[in-house]
Amino acid sequence: MQDRQKAQDYRALLLADTPLIDVRAPIEFEQGAMPGAINLPLMMDDERAAVGTCYKRQGADAALALGHRLVCGDIRQQRLEAWKAAYQRFPNGYLCCARGGQRSHIVQRWLQETGIDCPLIEGGYKALRQTAIQATWQLAQKPILLIGGCTGSGKTQLVRQQPNGVDLEGLARHRGSSFGRTLNPQLSQASFENKLAVELLKINARQTLKRWVLEDEGRTIGANHLPECLRERMAQAPIAVVEDPFALRLERLREEYFIRMHHDFTHAYGDEAGWQAYSEYLHHGLFAIRRRLGLQRFAELTDTLDRALAEQLSSGSTDGHMAWLVPLLNEYYDPMYRYQLEKKAANIVFRGTWQDVANWLKAQ
């Protein structure tokens, strides 16, 4: 343990996907955590709140004493068993609290009493978080190439195929549009940024990196927003635009939103509940842009969506969805993206089909 405890290289710890036994309270963990960390709190939220109030009113010694009274007996033993099991599962793991202070030291000492020497992160989560922020800023200074194109152009797939591609939407667990949510809930903003930083570090470590390849995104991806240092660099980056035939885009969207999402919902929740969740997902996506469509047009497209869902439920056919998807693209998504792209026209360095852009990227 001593070798692991000395002179910690935070970047190396993040690059290695080092298991972290995070002993902070659940509310702290939810607000921000490192990829792969598991939350096994020393104190639960209410216990931490009580200790914090005691600290403010009576000082550190009284707060520490209260903490020991709250976590004692069977509660202490149950949590100790959970930490022991976690260390046995991840013998190369580290304990982590907010700042490498009393909580991780207390858990470390209790484990030592059982014969387990588990190192802790000096500086705690805050030190790792600062390392992630600094890494993102530094790596965002490298050249960036954006992949642009209207909805359904296969941009994400193209980015994923590049050895230097960073799938921002995958990291954010959201595909960017009003229909972009996935079955996996989005991470907190800090956790998203931490995951992005680790991904950048890993890709940078695998190769001699000339530039990043990213999808042309807005300021936000669902509830997550891009780090400002990265967004500023993307705003100035050259863009390769995918221009595929409309019919091909429709087939990609059919596969992604009507076939795959239906499958994912029913696989997760069963046929009946999954169908209900899938239907609500499509309705929610349309409802989210009702004001931009205009209430009358929204009502018309909603009726068309209902008919398409009825047809899909009865026959399995997704053809009916084209009756609302086509006008949605023509009247809303395509004009919106083309307007945004026009403002960045000076940054466009290549236009072509998906395959043209893929070939162009290989030649760079």
Curated annotation (Swiss-Prot):
PROSITE patterns: RHODANESE_3. Keywords: Selenium, Transferase. It holds the Pfam family Rhodanese. Changing C97S: Reduces the level of geranylation but does not abolish it. Transmembrane segments: none annotated. Residues 14-137 form the Rhodanese domain. The active site is at C97 (s-selanylcysteine intermediate). NCBIfam families: PRK11784.1-1, PRK11784.1-3, tRNA_sel_U_synt. Involved in the post-transcriptional modification of the uridine at the wobble position (U34) of tRNA(Lys), tRNA(Glu) and tRNA(Gln). Catalyzes the conversion of 2-thiouridine (S2U-RNA) to 2-selenouridine (Se2U-RNA). Acts in a two-step process involving geranylation of 2-thiouridine (S2U) to S-geranyl-2-thiouridine (geS2U) and subsequent selenation of the latter derivative to 2-selenouridine (Se2U) in the tRNA chain. This is tRNA 2-selenouridine synthase. It comes from Salmonella typhimurium (strain LT2 / SGSC1412 / ATCC 700720). The gene is selU.
